[in-house]
UniProtKB/Swiss-Prot annotation:
UniProt-recorded name of the protein: Chalcone synthase 2
Similarity comment: Belongs to the thiolase-like superfamily. Chalcone/stilbene synthases family.
Domain of life from the UniProt record: Eukaryota
Pathway: Secondary metabolite biosynthesis; flavonoid biosynthesis
One Pfam family, short name: Chal_sti_synt_N
Biological process according to GO: flavonoid biosynthetic process; polyketide biosynthetic process
Transmembrane segments: none
Listed EC numbers: 2.3.1.74
Molecular function via GO: naringenin-chalcone synthase activity
Active site, renumbered: C167
Amino acid sequence: MAATMTVEEVRKAQRAEGPATVLAIGTATPANCVYQADYPDYYFKITKSDHMADLKEKFKRMCDKSQIRKRYMHLTEEILQDNPNMCAYMAPSLDARQDIVVVEVPKLGKAAAQKAIKEWGQPRSKITHLVFCTTSGVDMPGADYQLTKMLGLRPSVKRLMMYQQGCFAGGTVLRLAKDLAENNRGARVLVVCSEITAVTFRGPHESHLDSLVGQALFGDGAAAVIIGADPDESIERPLFQLVSASQTILPDSEGAIDGHLREVGLTFHLLKDVPGLISKNIERALEDAFKPLGIDDWNSVFWIAHPGGPAILDMVEAKVNLNKERMRATRHVLSEYGNMSSACVLFIMDEMRKRSAEDGHTTTGEGMDWGVLFGFGPGLTVETVVLHSVPVTA
């Protein structure tokens, strides 16, 4: 009779040897592109708010200061004309919004996932886990189920659906995928973040400028990554290693950012001191993450930071004395896509590895070995992921 394995032996056999690794990245946006310079006129016209001349001027200044050149939105003029309640500040419109996002969120996620799977180059039957994240609508079965069907993944794929997490969740999905990949030998985790602003779009109101800030910043996009440990480098090409991941709630930050799903859609509120709260606590997060590595020079690591808005990036840069180049990839994504909530950091990761190759850097992290990825969002919650780059291959 063969000897039975001990629990310890089973446990060891179940776990990977090395760290979780990003093996492919894909991104997608809706076809409809809106340019920030034209947006105030369009926004006040479509919401029938041109009579609010002073508010329109304030909104123009917000858009001018946003450092955003263009955004992509599923909501076209035709869709908004057909759904006038979505153009009001507070009118019952949840059904119309839900009808859009429960279809379009998985569809946009599929487009990003297909690109990631194509780059990965392996059969989709090798995908063992799916983590799907969105703050755009809620449904049962969820967007994870819809995407599984759309992509033809195995019925036994192990799914995790994350709804209503907000802008920090691009870090959350990486943290979860890291644990899944490292604790399940041979696992290949498809991670998808898909965000569509149809849940948050609304007309202006004089007494709620924080809502107007969101209208100036948010855009639509989806990003997908494939994560696994112990890559087979004869058929898989590592991009970044996920070395550590943590989450924390910032002190004295309750109510700084929140969102509420109501009959009128998802309402969004933020306090003016959000950039200050984040910048005040950023160094502590960096120290906690990098002390085990003996790193305390924040210009010696590459940066992927959720671009909640230009003020956050400016204040973080000032607080830790960052060179302007460190946030180059982050600011590029803000400029070209706006704030796409959870998808942003994955877009930035994609931009960084592509630009590192184009600029002749030796690693996927702009020539540096170590890097940090930050997600900021409701709570205030901060996700901190320590990354290690890999050598750039031709």
